[in-house]
């Protein structure tokens, strides 16, 4: 039998990866964030006309991207609507892996009784998925996220309600965002004990300037077989080389600011100059190489920024680069991790201090991130 070779990828975005051990769908290594797709939030995020949005989506698709993230509240609903219109216009729904979210109320400010349009309960879920499928012009979403944990819904109600959608074919995989690790592990344990689909993805804020996920979330994802979708990887657009003037184009609300953007930019810029790459490439490569199954969510409105981010997929940081970046601010891993280990993220028994005093041991190496691809785009993946 003669096997036809696949079409060569146009960029590293077209070398797709398995999403997670618990989710075997294949996705592009970068996910296009839909928060900036729409014009309803122009005052806070800048202008994005439908023509601009479609150009960005076309560029993402043409370069091999197939993973798009949105939510029921983004841009007052325009994000889902425009993404759905773009997929329908080009007949690309089957090629794309689309995630959306529920929990935050899309009716804020409307003169109606809003009690059940938000939250993690069954009615909020029912209303949200109905409207999301209509807006996206599809009969299913690949991933449905719990957008944030509201501490109001019991785990059994949540997991059974989500799995009703799984059984109906309206949702393929489940994700959770902005929630404590203990909630996720408790929910996944309940799901497995009751023959239900567990969470396969976690979305949270993570970057060189905000490494909180290293305490509990990243180890949890690896133990649970989950992918990590970090947002804010590029400092919410505020990682900038000191050599370049601030245009003021990015208008980020104060709650999204960390306060370390300027100092971390200097550290990242020093590494970027050694590699002769943009500062954003270093910020992106750092997150991609920290753990396996990491798929950053990248926003923005300009195709040229997207193309620059794709180039980061070929950048391999050295151990010295990573150490330099992590000295950019004093990250405290906290108790009990600092008590058990050596001050960094614990990946296994090799990182536990009391064991190192008991002898010399060999352990199976922890799972690592995929190394940046080098050489021809069609060349086989190199050794880890």
UniProtKB/Swiss-Prot annotation:
Annotated GO molecular function terms are: oxidoreductase activity
At the highest ranks, the source species' classification is: Eukaryota, Fungi, Dikarya, Ascomycota, Pezizomycotina
UniProt-annotated catalytic positions: 74 (proton donor)
Q: Which family does it belong to?
A: Belongs to the aldo/keto reductase family. Aldo/keto reductase 2 subfamily.
The enzyme's main class, written as a single word, is oxidoreductase
- Enzyme Commission code(s) on record: 1.1.1.-
One Pfam family hit = Aldo_ket_red
Taxonomic superkingdom: Eukaryota
KW Ribosomal protein (keyword) present: no
Source organism of the structure = Pestalotiopsis microspora
Name of the molecule in the record: Aryl-alcohol dehydrogenase GME11368
**Task performed by this protein:** Aryl-alcohol dehydrogenase; part of the gene cluster that mediates the biosynthesis of dibenzodioxocinones such as pestalotiollide B, a novel class of inhibitors against cholesterol ester transfer protein (CEPT). The biosynthesis initiates from condensation of acetate and malonate units catalyzed by the non-reducing PKS pks8/GME11356. Pks8/GME11356 lacks a thioesterase (TE) domain, which is important to the cyclizing of the third ring of atrochrysone carboxylic acid, and the esterase GME11355 might play the role of TE and catalyzes the cyclization reaction of the C ring.
**What are the record keywords, sorted?**
NADP, Oxidoreductase
Q: Which PANTHER family match?
A: NADH-SPECIFIC METHYLGLYOXAL REDUCTASE-RELATED, NADP-DEPENDENT OXIDOREDUCTASE DOMAIN-CONTAINING PROTEIN-RELATED
**Binding-site list for NADP(+):** 69, 177-178, 203, 301-309
């Amino acid at each position: 039998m003669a096997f036809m070779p696949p079409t060569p990828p146009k960029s590293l975005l077209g070398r797709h990866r398995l999403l997670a051990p618990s989710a075997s769908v294949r996705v592009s290594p970068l996910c296009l964030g839909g928060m900036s797709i729409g014009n309803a939030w122009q005052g806070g995020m800048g202008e994005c006309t439908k023509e601009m949005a479609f150009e960005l989506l076309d560029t993402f698709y043409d370069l091999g991207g197939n993973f798009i993230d949105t939510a029921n509240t983004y841009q007052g609903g325009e994000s889902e609507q425009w993404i759905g219109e773009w997929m329908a216009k080009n007949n690309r729904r089957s090629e794309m892996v689309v995630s959306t979210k529920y929990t935050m109320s899309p009716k804020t400010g409307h003169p109606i009784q809003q009690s059940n349009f938000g939250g993690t309960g069954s009615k909020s879920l029912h209303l949200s998925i109905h409207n999301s499928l209509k807006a996206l012009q599809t009969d299913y979403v690949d991933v449905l996220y719990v957008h944030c944990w509201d501490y109001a819904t019991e785990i059994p109600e949540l997991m059974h309600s989500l799995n009703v959608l799984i059984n109906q074919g309206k949702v393929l995989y489940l994700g959770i965002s902005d929630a404590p690790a203990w909630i996720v592990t408790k929910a996944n344990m309940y799901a497995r004990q009751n023959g239900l689909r567990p969470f396969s993805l976690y979305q949270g804020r993570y970057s060189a300037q905000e490494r909180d996920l290293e305490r509990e979330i990243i180890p949890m994802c690896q133990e649970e077989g989950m992918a990590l979708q970090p947002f804010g990887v590029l400092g919410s657009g505020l990682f900038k080389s000191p050599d370049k003037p601030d245009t003021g184009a990015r208008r980020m609300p104060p709650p999204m600011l960390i306060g370390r953007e300027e100092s971390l930019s200097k550290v990242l810029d020093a590494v970027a100059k050694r590699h002769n790459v943009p500062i954003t490439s270093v910020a992106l490569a750092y997150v991609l190489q920290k753990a396996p199954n990491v798929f950053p969510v990248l926003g923005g409105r300009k195709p040229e920024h997207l193309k620059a981010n794709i180039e980061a997929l070929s950048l391999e940081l050295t151990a010295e680069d990573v150490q330099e970046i992590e000295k950019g601010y004093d990250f405290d891993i906290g108790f009990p991790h600092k008590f058990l280990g050596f001050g960094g993220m614990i990946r296994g028994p090799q990182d536990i201090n009391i064991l190192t005093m008991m002898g010399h041991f060999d352990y199976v190496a922890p799972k690592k991130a995929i190394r940046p691809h080098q050489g021809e785009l069609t060349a086989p993946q190199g050794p880890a």
